[in-house]
Swiss-Prot record:
Keyword Transmembrane helix among record annotations: no
UniProt-recorded Gene Ontology molecular function terms: ribosomal large subunit binding
Family per similarity comment: Belongs to the RRF family.
InterPro entries: Ribosome_recyc_fac, Ribosome_recyc_fac_dom, RRF_sf
Protein name, as recorded: Ribosome-recycling factor
């Protein structure tokens, strides 16, 4: 029973890290990256549809994303969805494809994006701490219900803390790497 609590905590902390990793992938670092468009939803025949399911996305140049819709009639819908997103990019629609030119980042904008990375990291660490808190409560309940001894509870709490520290360290490392990528451009 007690190992289930630890295993569940590890799984949930890893999920928090995965969510953070996917959020980091959508942060613009001044270079074209197809994952920038992962969260863009297009209103397609009245149904919100992920852009990546509606179009091929290629990178013909280091700072250009080219979006080729599978259905040419959705070109304007895709353009509107990109404009409505929080990407801060202006699409160029030539009637067949949409080009997104990723502008060079100014020093000020780099700092803003680095702060955003920090904010995302803090949200991920809060999620990890919430998982830790749930695991600790579960261990206390197990001890109270007589499922585990007090010594076992302390040992397992230390293990939960160790997993929490490892997860937090991993998040910090990912944030530092992304900040370096952004600052160096």
């Amino acid at each position: 029973m007690n190992n289930e609590t630890i295993a569940k905590a590890k799984r949930n902390m890893n999920k928090s890290i995965e969510v953070y990793q996917s959020n980091l992938a959508t942060v613009r670092a001044g270079v074209a990256n197809a994952s920038l468009l992962d969260r863009v939803m297009v209103e397609y025949y009245g149904v919100p549809t992920p852009l990546v399911q509606m179009a091929g996305i290629t990178i013909p140049e280091p700072r250009v994303l080219m979006i080729t819709p599978y259905d040419k009639t959705s070109l304007n819908d895709i353009e509107h969805a990109i404009l409505a997103s929080d990407l801060g990019l202006t699409p160029a629609n030539d009637g067949n494809v949409i080009r997104l030119i990723i502008p060079q980042l100014t020093g000020e904008r780099r700092q803003e994006i680095a702060k955003e990375v920090g904010k995302l990291a803090e949200e991920a660490k809060i999620a990890v701490r919430n998982v830790r808190q749930e695991a600790m409560k579960a261990l206390k309940k197990q001890e109270k219900d007589g499922e585990i001894t007090e010594d076992e509870e302390r040992r397992l709490e230390k293990e939960v803390q160790k997993v929490t520290d490892e997860s937090t360290k991993k998040i910090d490392q990912m944030a530092d790497n992304k900040r370096k990528e952004i600052i160096q451009g």
